[in-house]
């Protein structure tokens, strides 16, 4: 009997130990994994933040950096490559705000505030944003709608202004600055809108920072009506509460242009082409049943679509 009781006690002890170990080594839940990934991503974002407060574009936010790679990134803190192109800076600020909400790590909060300060400082007095700041050169100094740059920055500032739950750490004074920046940005948008015979149409991907006229960027980004960036601009304007007469006219003019400029009876298809990068190309073919589509660029003088 004594032997049996001893065995039962040993089994009970082993069971308790195994249970404890299994609890410690159990797979993390989906929420825990998500929080861990968010935290790791925020750490990478901290590394890449420039001393100006902004971020460069196209680095890998999910990257797991070696010691050598971390040292290299840290050595580039003074690099003048911070910008708002391709989602840079305004995306990082959102991710840092989320990471701070999950972890209460003040480093994420402080970096987000520094990024917001960067965006406010980067805005021109006329309300526009250059693609790159500080000391923008070449086409990077133009007022940049290309790839959602200016609208991405303005959308973030608008969210900071109204979403106190996501951005509780932003002071009342900074929120007020965000509000003024948005108003100034809207004024700039209206000044940039291209007029033809006195009628409002749409926007170019980039505009002159002094005259507001359409401007060229890269070789294939010519002064033109943009069938892409203009969509994002209109959506932003449509979200304005109680818009003024000028904003309503801007939206109506742009919508009319889109209606007149739609392309019917054609569609874009992907074809194999080993001579092209990725082994494929895109071509336009006739199709009477195709849904309407719009070109990325339209000639300002003729309103004809063109391909570069």
Question: What feature does the model see in each segment?
Answer:
Residues 27-79, 196:
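Low-complexity, Ser/Thr/Pro/Gly-enriched N-terminal "stalk/linker" regions
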Residues 40-53, 111-128, 179-198, 250-267:
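Long, well-ordered core segments of solenoidal/helical folds
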Residues 16-24:
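Hydrophobic h-region of N-terminal signal peptides that target proteins for export
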Residues 109, 113-116, 120, 137, ...:
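Eukaryote-skewed repeat-based solenoidal scaffolds used as protein-protein interaction platforms
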Residues 29-33, 41, 46, 90-105, ...:
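Well-ordered alpha-helical scaffold segments within catalytic/enzyme domains
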Residues 55, 195, 199, 256-308:
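CBM-like carbohydrate-recognition segments
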Residues 2-12:
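Bacterial N-terminal signal peptides that target proteins for export
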Residues 30-34, 74-89, 137-150, 216-229, ...:
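Solvent-exposed loop and edge beta-strand segments that line ligand/cofactor-binding
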């Amino acid at each position: 009997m004594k032997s049996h009781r001893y065995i039962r006690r040993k089994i009970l002890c082993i069971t308790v130990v195994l249970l404890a170990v299994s609890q410690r080594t159990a797979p993390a839940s989906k929420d825990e994994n998500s929080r861990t990934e968010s935290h790791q991503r925020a750490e990478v974002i901290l590394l890449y933040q420039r001393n100006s407060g902004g971020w460069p574009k196209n680095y890998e936010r999910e990257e797991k950096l070696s010691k050598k790679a971390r040292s290299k990134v840290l050595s580039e803190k003074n690099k003048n490559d911070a910008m708002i192109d391709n989602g840079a800076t305004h995306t990082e600020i959102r991710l840092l705000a989320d990471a701070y909400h999950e972890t209460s790590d003040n480093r994420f909060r402080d970096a987000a505030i520094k990024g917001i300060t960067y965006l406010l400082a980067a805005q021109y007095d006329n309300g526009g944003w250059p693609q790159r700041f500080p000391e923008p050169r070449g086409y990077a100094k133009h007022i940049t709608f290309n790839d959602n740059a200016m609208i991405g920055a303005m959308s973030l500032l608008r969210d900071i202004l109204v979403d106190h739950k996501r951005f509780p750490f932003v002071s009342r004074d900074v929120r007020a600055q965000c509000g003024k920046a948005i108003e100034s940005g809207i004024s700039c948008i209206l000044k940039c809108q291209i007029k033809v015979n006195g009628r409002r149409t749409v926007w170019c991907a980039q505009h002159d920072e002094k005259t507001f006229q359409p401007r060229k960027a890269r070789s294939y980004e010519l002064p033109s009506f943009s069938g892409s960036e203009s969509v994002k601009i209109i959506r932003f304007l449509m979200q304005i509460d109680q818009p003024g007469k000028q904003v309503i006219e801007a939206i109506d003019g742009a919508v009319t242009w889109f209606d007149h400029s739609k392309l019917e009876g054609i569609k874009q298809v992907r074809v194999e082409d080993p001579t092209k990068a990725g082994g494929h190309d895109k071509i336009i073919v006739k199709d009477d049943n195709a849904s309407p589509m719009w070109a990325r660029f339209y000639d300002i003088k003729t309103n004809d679509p063109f391909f570069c």
